[in-house]
Structures are given as C-alpha cells and as structure tokens.
Amino acid sequence: MKKELLKILREKKPLVHHITNIVTVNDCANITLAIGALPVMAHALEEVEEMVSAADALVLNIGTLTNEQVEAMIKAGKAANRLKVPVILDPVGAGATKLRTQSSKKILEEVKISVIKGNSAEISILAGKGGKIRGVESQSGADDISEAAKDLANAYNVVVAVSGVTDIITDGKRIAYVKNGHPMMGTVTGTGCMLTSVVASFCGVCEDYFAATVEAFVAFGIAGERAAQSSNVKGPGSFKVTFFDEIYNLTPEIIEKDKKVEYE
C-alpha cells in the first residue's frame, strides 16, 4: 500500500465529478468531502464534457440510470479518457435487468475504465459467469469470485474491486484481500456508492489505481469498524453519522495500524 496516500489526498483535494444515482447523491458528496476531496455532481449531457475537464476523477454510477444518463456517462467518460482522468464505474444492479446489464457493458466497451467496483454478483455477471440479483443485492454465480474478478480485469485492462465480507481487489496480476469492515455498514443504504466515491478520491491523486483502490477500501473499512465500536451508536441512524465522523478523523497512522490486507 502507498503510505501517506491519505495525507496526499487531503493536501491536493482532488475534484471528483459524479454522474450518480438520485438515492445516494447527497451521501456521496458528503463522504467525498469527509475523506478530503471535493465533489461535483453534474449530469446534464450539455455540460458533462466541460465539467470533467476540471476534474481529477470521474464516477459513473448506474444506480438510477436512464438512457439519457448513460449517454452523458459515455460522453463524460470519453472526455476523461482524452484528458487521462481516471474513470470509476459502479455497475449497480448489473444483472437485475437487461437495461442495467447492457448499459454496463456498453460503457465498458466505449470508455476506458480505470476501476470497476461492484458486489460479487455484478462482477460475476460482467465477467460472464452468471449470478443472481434481487433488487441490487447479490449472489455470485462464480465458484471463485477471485478468478472472475481477474478475468474481468484482464479482459478490459482494468482494476476490479469486489466488495464483500472480504473485499477483493485485482488488476489481473496483483490481488489483495481486504478484511476491514463491519456488518453495521450493511444496515445503511448507499455505503457501496459512498465507497466508490472514496475510491475515486484516492485514484485522483495516485496513478497506481490498484494501490489507490486498496487504500480506499482499507480506509473505508476501518472507519466502519471504529464507528461500530462507538458508544454513540444505537442503530443505523447514529451509525451513519458516526461513520462520516470516523472517515473525517482518519489519519495515515490509524490506517497503518488497523489495516487488514493480504496480497497474492
């Protein structure tokens, strides 16, 4: 892992352009601020190309997608590619409907993605291994999600990050298993979307997108652990507030001390 990456992030304050869903847009903006980056939420087809030209990273999240939004994502993504701005794709619910699956694949074919972040079923489906989605919750169809993630990473020359009890991050060659996190994180809707924003924030200051993604997952998981241990937490509502505070109060020293990562 890149030491002091959080310190660099907070010094540089990368601008993260989001084209994201209407369910979690406010939380994604605030978690981006809490980690030390700057959010901008711009969806209009007429302005996304101009907006991404000022950004350090671009998030494409299909959680509440429309055909017009997918068009805006592709336009922004192509502009980001020309400008060498990292693009992070969150294929929320890929496999749940044809629109979500086809839109995810269309974006992957037309835009050079830097990081794909999804749950096991989303990644398994995009890797061609099958899977089951109920709403946007998942059950992988792959016997070995690590291999499915590596296959997808190699197919698109991209970092693939699979969130779960143990998170898996791979660039097709390197692979990391992150064991930070807490079950309480699953009681708050949008934690996956917020994690994507944190991944983008780190990718905005580190060109090794594998290392940046590992650092983001570790930081996010540690904040969840620390929030869950707080005496202020009585349930999902107080957990969410405390989680934001723990993201804000993270330091490189805390990350180094509490990280749980294994590499292959």
Curated annotation (Swiss-Prot):
One GO BP: thiamine biosynthetic process
Protein name: Hydroxyethylthiazole kinase
Protein family (similarity comment): Belongs to the Thz kinase family.
Protein's organism: Thermoanaerobacter pseudethanolicus (strain ATCC 33223 / 39E)
NCBIfam families tied to this protein: PRK09355.1 (NF006830), thiM (TIGR00694)
Catalytic activity: 5-(2-hydroxyethyl)-4-methylthiazole + ATP = 4-methyl-5-(2-phosphooxyethyl)-thiazole + ADP + H(+)
SUPFAM superfamilies in UniProt: Ribokinase-like
One MF annotation (Gene Ontology) recorded for this entry: hydroxyethylthiazole kinase activity
Entry keyword set: ATP-binding, Kinase, Magnesium, Metal-binding, Nucleotide-binding, Thiamine biosynthesis, Transferase
Binding locations of substrate: 41, 190
Role summary: Catalyzes the phosphorylation of the hydroxyl group of 4-methyl-5-beta-hydroxyethylthiazole (THZ).
Listed CDD domains: THZ_kinase (cd01170)
Documented EC number(s): 2.7.1.50
UniProt cross-references to Pfam families, sorted A to Z: HK
Entry cofactors: Mg(2+)
Ligand binding (ATP): 117, 163
Pathway linked to the protein: Cofactor biosynthesis; thiamine diphosphate biosynthesis; 4-methyl-5-(2-phosphoethyl)-thiazole from 5-(2-hydroxyethyl)-4-methylthiazole: step 1/1
